[in-house]
Regions:
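Nucleic-acid substrate recognition interfaces
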Residues: 1-161
Length: 161
C-alpha cells in the first residue's frame, strides 16, 4: 500500500539563490494574476475558459514576450497555472452544488503580501544534506528526518516565512 507523507525542512539559500527565489515567487504570482485576468475577460465576453493545457501552451508564448520569465523554474509557472485551474474547478463545482464542504468563492488576485510560495517537481535530497532544487542547484538544508529508501518526492513547496 502506498502512503503519502510530508516532510518540512528549513533551507539556507545563498544570496544568489535568494534573488532567484524572489524572482520565482514574483513570476509565479504574475502568471497566476495574468491568466486569472484572462479567464475573467473570457467570462465577461461569454467565451470558453482556458484549460490548464491551453494556459501551459500559452506560457511559452508569454516567455517569448517576457524573456525574464525564462530565468525561473518553468515547472513553478506550470504549477501556478494548475493552481488557477483547480481554483476555478472548485469554484464552479461549489456553485453548482457538486462540491462537498463549504462554498468556495471565485479565485482572487494575488498580491505581493500574499503567502510567497511555489511548487515544483524534481527535487532530490543529496547525501551531504543539501536539497537539489531545479534552477537553484544544491541548497543548504537541515535534513532532520530522512526520506525512506525506495520513496519518490512527488512535489515540493518552497515558501518564505
Amino acid at each position: 500500500m502506498k502512503q503519502l507523507k510530508a516532510f518540512k525542512y528549513r533551507i539556507y539559500p545563498t544570496e544568489e539563490q535568494q534573488v532567484l527565489l524572489a524572482k520565482t515567487f514574483g513570476c509565479k504570482r504574475l502568471i497566476f494574476n495574468h491568466y486569472l485576468n484572462e479567464q475573467q475577460e473570457r467570462y465577461k465576453n461569454k467565451e470558453k475558459h482556458l484549460s490548464n493545457y491551453d494556459i501551459n501552451k500559452d506560457i511559452t508564448n508569454l516567455k517569448n514576450k517576457m524573456e525574464w520569465l525564462r530565468e525561473v523554474d518553468s515547472i513553478a509557472l506550470q504549477m501556478a497555472a494548475e493552481d488557477l485551474s483547480v481554483a476555478y474547478e472548485n469554484f464552479f463545482k461549489s456553485v453548482s452544488g457538486k462540491r462537498k464542504g463549504p462554498k468556495v468563492s471565485a479565485p482572487k488576485f494575488k498580491n505581493k503580501h500574499s503567502r510567497q510560495s511555489y511548487r515544483t517537481r524534481g527535487v532530490r535530497v543529496n547525501e551531504d544534506g543539501t536539497l537539489q532544487i531545479p534552477k537553484l542547484k544544491a541548497v543548504e538544508a537541515v535534513v532532520h528526518r530522512t526520506i525512506p529508501e525506495n520513496s519518490t518526492i512527488k512535489s515540493t513547496t518552497i515558501s518564505r516565512n
